[in-house]
Amino acid sequence: MRGTTENTDLFDPKTQMDPDFTRHGSSSDGDFGFAFNDSNFSDRLLRIEIMGGPSDSRSEVEGCTSIADWARHRKRRREDIKKESGVTISDIVACPEEQILTDEQPDMDGCPGGENPDDEGGEAMVEEALSGDEEETSSEPNWGMDCSTVVRVKELHISSPILAAKSPFFYKLFSNGMRESEQRHVTLRINASEEAALMELLNFMYSNAVSVTTAPALLDVLMAADKFEVASCMRYCSRLLRNMPMTPESALLYLELPSSVLMAKAVQPLTDAAKQFLAARYKDITKFHEEVMSLPLAGIEAILSSDELQIASEDAVYDFILKWARAQYPCLEERREILGSRLALSIRFPFMTCRKLKKVLTCSDFEHEIASKLVLEALFFKAEAPHRQRSLASEESASLNRRLIERAYKYRPVKVVEFELPRPQCVVYLDLKREECGGLFPSGRVYSQAFHLGGQGFFLSAHCNMDQQSSFHCFGLFLGMQEKGSVSFGVDYEFSARSKPAEDFISKYKGNYTFTGGKAVGYRNLFGVPWTSFIAEDSQYFINGILHLRAELTIKRSTDP
């Protein structure tokens, strides 16, 4: 019907709208579902021409029952279109403004029904492509549908104010002051695979809801919403997808959305949820080593961006990234590019050991200039006073770059000062947060990263023990030597801790021990108090929530008294 042809246009082009179109598809937007495709509440007729072609099988589209099916079909369709015309779907998505006829487009006199510019029966063509018959008489953009034909036509009564309120695309179409904005017939040309999604999108613009419930169907609607600039529908679909059970396959697909759509901000919450899912699933990468090694770059970045990564140390993160990069990018130049521009941001160099930082400087996988810059930044951070380090970390915690934020390492970082004269000696500082100590109860333990003295590796370990004499839990500290050969030698050691009110290091225990590989020595109750007193809010050993421990080691020589 064309009963609305004689009516006054319901849409006033001069009406000012929110430029960001920030509606959220909620009930507060009002439900105009009753007006959908009803001539009584419409001022225009939308003609949808559905194109058929070698890449558009409806049965194939409807057969997508999973995210993996959807991704495979979308990839296959993109490749088919590229073969047919050399133009990809991303080219179409990137140029939505070309779908609207402007002054630079061919004169309408050369188009069907264009002899009389004032004839309201003329159509404002808003097309994705032209058929082969029209190509010789028009210079419209060709988007890879030369072999397609119109296999079906749908006509819907639409309300321009409703569509324009939801979509900048339709707003521009209906208010550009040109002839097509005054006409009552508007034609869209779409692929057969897009038909269901477009109908859902149009229905959403009236009712703020969609009827589809599967992830593949919601993704189709989301992509259609992006093409026609309906941000509220993109947010709505993103929210529904976010509430569905996620899988590694779906999470990886969601990570790609920002680079596949124009309105990336609308899908950011979904992308963030995908990152959180992957980070939580693979937080202990040693348990899923083969699976993680096969993940794409975006998945690796999501996992390694987490503060909760359960890994021995940042040295282990560095080693894993090198192994993954060498497997995924055999070409050295490509690997250097990916490491320097992307993956280096996932390595928290300030928390690597100095021994490993030395290896970074000589690693051929990194450009030398980049490696030098990263190592220098790490060393400067290590040289800062603790309060300054905390200040720098807090400043960076609000940013996307979290290289100065310490992870929950299995082996806690230590600071080491070494002396060679008058005898081999080192002073080791280990800081533990109150929460870390609290997590040790009733029988846990936490280890420090290894440090070296006299060519041998040592470590500290903090325990929650049962005091054998008094039968209560207490805090213990031990010094161990890494198992390496049968070497044994004597070490003088002293354990100290800062305590209130002076907050100076106070010696707790000292002794000497002849170490052999794998042995450890220490004190089951370092502070001589029950666990409850040690961990209490008014404990004298926690300063601003941090327990500061120090161990001094000196190698005994045979000539020493």
UniProtKB/Swiss-Prot annotation:
GO biological process, one term: response to red light
Region Disordered, residue ranges: 1-29, 103-122
Extent of Basic and acidic residues compositional bias: 11-23
Pathway entry: Protein modification; protein ubiquitination
The keyword NAD belongs to this UniProt entry's keyword annotation: no
Keyword Transmembrane helix: no
Domain BTB: from-to ranges: 145-214
Entry GO terms, CC: nucleus
Molecular function in Gene Ontology: protein heterodimerization activity; protein homodimerization activity
Origin superkingdom: Eukaryota
Residues annotated as domain BACK: 268-360
Keywords noted in UniProt: Ubl conjugation pathway
Matches recorded under Gene3D superfamilies: 1.25.40.420, Potassium Channel Kv1.1, Chain A
InterPro entries, A to Z: BACK, BTB/POZ_dom, POB1-like, SKP1/BTB/POZ_sf
Domain observations: The BTB/POZ domain mediates the interaction with some component of ubiquitin ligase complexes.
Job description of the protein: May act as a substrate-specific adapter of an E3 ubiquitin-protein ligase complex (CUL3-RBX1-BTB) which mediates the ubiquitination and subsequent proteasomal degradation of target proteins.
Protein name: BTB/POZ domain-containing protein POB1
Organism taxonomic ancestry: Eukaryota, Viridiplantae, Streptophyta, Embryophyta, Tracheophyta
Gene: POB1
